[in-house]
Curated annotation (Swiss-Prot):
UniProt entry tagged with the keyword Ribonucleoprotein: no
Keyword hit for DNA damage: yes
CDD domains per the UniProt record, alphabetical: UBA_RuvA_C
Similarity comment: family membership: Belongs to the RuvA family.
Domain II: annotated span: 68-146
Subunit: Homotetramer. Forms an RuvA(8)-RuvB(12)-Holliday junction (HJ) complex. HJ DNA is sandwiched between 2 RuvA tetramers; dsDNA enters through RuvA and exits via RuvB. An RuvB hexamer assembles on each DNA strand where it exits the tetramer. Each RuvB hexamer is contacted by two RuvA subunits (via domain III) on 2 adjacent RuvB subunits; this complex drives branch migration. In the full resolvosome a probable DNA-RuvA(4)-RuvB(12)-RuvC(2) complex forms which resolves the HJ.
Organism: Synechococcus sp. (strain JA-2-3B'a(2-13)) (Cyanobacteria bacterium Yellowstone B-Prime)
Region annotation (Domain III) ranges: 157-204
Function as written in the Swiss-Prot or TrEMBL entry: The RuvA-RuvB-RuvC complex processes Holliday junction (HJ) DNA during genetic recombination and DNA repair, while the RuvA-RuvB complex plays an important role in the rescue of blocked DNA replication forks via replication fork reversal (RFR). RuvA specifically binds to HJ cruciform DNA, conferring on it an open structure. The RuvB hexamer acts as an ATP-dependent pump, pulling dsDNA into and through the RuvAB complex. HJ branch migration allows RuvC to scan DNA until it finds its consensus sequence, where it cleaves and resolves the cruciform DNA.
Protein known as: Holliday junction branch migration complex subunit RuvA
Length: 204
């Protein structure tokens, strides 16, 4: 198994291909990755390290890449779930940051999980059912459990605010960024929602 690649970034492909090419000792490796990770990459030509998971298919070998061992390991757990292949695994990690995704699974937030492109209600339920206990233990071992989200309301207020903002047309990425940017002092759901809308309206 190829645990990681350490070399120079050659290219980034966006959209459906969503991948990067890394040159390691004269060999170029094409690695599929979530768009969220691609946005964090340095400029082409700069050194880069990508943590990888190899998926063996009948006709090809496919490398999937991530920004940390924890993201890679979470991807591996996701694709073990029946009906969740690598494409949906990437979609989940592109829609949510690692702490948000783990929290959504552990708290069985099916409505939030099903907002991921390609993830229906039944698949979201299956994710929560099969991974809830496993991820609760896994995140403790990875040190994720004791790392609260940077900003944002506590559950279940967070879920109410997220659903209200989604109904207003904001994307999941925009909502997560807004909630993490807000101060954490206690306040009613309505105030959290108003503050989030104010923040989002000020963004370019």
């Amino acid at each position: 198994m190829i645990a990681f690649l350490s070399g120079h970034l050659v290219a980034i492909e966006w959209g459906e291909r969503s991948s990067l090419t890394v040159e390691v000792q004269g060999i170029g490796y094409r690695v599929k990755a979530p768009g969220r990770f691609l946005k964090q990459l340095p400029a082409v030509g700069e050194p880069v390290r990508v943590f990888t998971h190899l998926v063996v298919r009948e006709t090809e070998l496919v490398l999937y890449g991530f920004g940390s061992p924890a993201e890679r390991d979470l991807f591996v757990e996701l694709i073990k779930v029946s009906g969740v292949g690598p494409a949906l695994g990437l979609a989940l990690l592109n829609t949510f940051g690692l702490p948000e995704l783990v929290q959504a699974v552990v708290t069985e937030n099916v409505r939030l999980l099903s907002l991921t492109p390609g993830v229906g209600h039944k698949t979201a339920q299956r994710l929560a059912l099969e991974l809830k206990t496993k991820l609760a233990h896994w995140r403790q071992g990875m040190g994720v459990a004791d790392q609260p989200l940077a900003g944002g309301p506590p559950m279940p207020i967070r879920e109410e605010v997220e659903m209200a903002l989604l109904a207003l047309g904001y994307s999941t990425q925009e909502i997560q960024a807004a909630l993490q940017a807000l101060p954490t002092h206690p306040r009613p759901t309505e105030d959290w929602l108003r503050d989030a809308i104010t923040y989002l309206s000020q963004q370019p």
